[in-house]
Amino acid sequence: MHIPDGYLSPVTCAVTFAATVPFWYVSMRKLDRDLNGQHLPLVALVAAFSFVIMMFNLPIPGGTTAHAAGIGIAAVLLGPWAAVPAISVALLIQAIFFGDGGITAFGANCLNMAVVGPMVAAAVYALGTRGAAIGSRRRVIMAGLASYAGLNAAALLAAVEFGVQPLFFHDAAGAPLYAPYPLSVAVPAMALTHLTIAGAAEFIVTAGLVAWLQRSNPELLAPRRAPAAPERHLRLWAGIGALVVLCPLGLIAAGTAWGEWGAEDFTSEAGRAAMAGASGGVAPPAGLPGGFARLAELWSAPLPDYAPAFVQNAPLGYVLSALLGVALIVAGIGLSAGLRALTRRAG
């Protein structure tokens, strides 16, 4: 679901970025005013979890892959507004340092996964848990269903963004300039991936975490809670550490996620066959789309595909990338908190 550079026209990128900016602004104001910045440690924890869980790729029939995104647990623990910066920070680190998601498509990816996904998940969870006790089984089930709904809402929006490209952005001969597949292909392909494997993974991860938190940290599930002491998060950070160690399991699933093919896939016989196999047998247009070629190489991530060039062992490189990503998230949010505190004192 991470849209790379080259798949969306500059107009689409500008529109989706502009649509996301108000949500970033309001969410940061709410985080600062309503929560007084005291929940930032939990925001950092959720952002780190989202970053790492997205590294666990799962095989999809047709030769592609998908993953959970942490959308549901972000909505449950933080609420829809604080989830926006949490997921956005994870997506920013992924795009800049690891080339997972495009720089030009950053606004679109945030709109899908950091705004729409958590908003839908939070709405479903709030509706389904009204009047339910913190330790009730209903909260576990609704957390899973909410995460499933949020992930699929994000995937549907991404599919629409992919699918409208050939309709609005093509050359004089009708050849697509950016994403090659129309809505009739993009929507079913993304639905197959996220209504099944990815959605099930998001459901299981979120429901499992909520069930565990009911026993270990039930105060985190309270809608109007006081900020937890940092030591109350230690077990959660230990869990993220365990996920970092286990993240090379995400390398087992071969293939590329739908809509994330590289330039070489458009021009090689094997790549084109893989694209067609994942798209209901519909072959992509011949050649590399012109607009795609101009944007795809706009940014070269220093550690593309979570594979540091200086590490020859792929699993070790994957773990080091996960550690670096988590460290950057914590440092970035910590720096933000420090600057906010200095601003308050100066004011």
Curated annotation (Swiss-Prot):
Family: Belongs to the CbiM family. NikM subfamily.
UniProt-recorded name of the protein: Fused nickel transport protein NikMN
Classification via NCBIfam families: PRK11909.1
Alphabetical keyword list: Cell inner membrane, Cell membrane, Ion transport, Membrane, Nickel, Nickel transport, Transmembrane, Transmembrane helix, Transport
Pfam family, one: CbiM
InterPro entries: CbiM/NikMN, PDGLE_dom
Membrane topology label: Multi-pass membrane protein
Native source species: Rhodobacter capsulatus (strain ATCC BAA-309 / NBRC 16581 / SB1003)
Gene3D superfamilies noted in UniProt: 1.10.1760.20
Quaternary organization: Forms an energy-coupling factor (ECF) transporter complex composed of an ATP-binding protein (A component, NikO), a transmembrane protein (T component, NikQ) and a fused possible substrate-capture protein (S component, NikMN) of unknown stoichimetry.
Subcellular location(s) of the protein: Cell inner membrane
Stated role: Part of the energy-coupling factor (ECF) transporter complex NikMNQO involved in nickel import. The complex confers nickel uptake upon expression in E.coli; can also transport cobalt with a very low affinity.
Record field: transmembrane: 6-26, 40-60, 73-93, 96-116, 140-160, 185-205, 236-256, 273-293, 319-339
Gene field: nikMN
Main localization category: membrane
Example of a GO cellular component annotation carried by this entry: ATP-binding cassette (ABC) transporter complex
Species classification: Bacteria, Pseudomonadati, Pseudomonadota, Alphaproteobacteria, Rhodobacterales
GO terms under biological process: nickel cation transport
